[in-house]
Amino acid sequence: MNTNVNKLNEVTSISNRAMKFRLSRGGTKRRVRDRDAEAVVKQQLGDEGQIVSRQLFKDKNNLVNQYQNKANEMYTYHVRSTLPFGDDASRVLPNTSYFTYTQKMQDFISELAIMRNRILTDWSKLVQDDINLRNADLAAQGKPQSAQTSDYPTLAQMENTLYVSWFPEPISTVNDFRFSLEPEMLEI
């Protein structure tokens, strides 16, 4: 009787029917603190708690925005295709969806890698174009042109923040040394 139960447990074990995947991704900061505007607001309103920030990379066609949108699209696909598993951000994928899911995720990762390389190659031009756009917007509003290079992350910072880490993990089973059950539980 006990061998039949063991065989049934082997067949119905979640480790035979699903896989765990973990995804983490980085992005770039797209807002900068505007200390000049903060000083004016604090002086006029008398509120020392005010923080004013300005949007970076306002142009929706900017490669940085495209990268962020693609990373968000990948994350949304990952969440919709998998189920939550535990508190460590792992997600469970049914084995029947494995090939479709992994192919789509690999496509996303390849696209993001190409975009990342383009961003890093053209970083100084992307920053300068955005500075010009922000300063033109400020000038059109009659405000001083305060956008500057120091508002943006450096190339080295960008290299560290634009990443995708995606990998499968085994699902723990009764035989896994990291997972133990009391002998009484094994008999149930």
PLM features: what roles do these ranges have?
Residues 89, 93-187:
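Long amphipathic alpha-helical segments with strong coiled-coil/leucine-zipper propensity
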Residues 1-119:
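An N-terminal, globular interaction/scaffold subdomain
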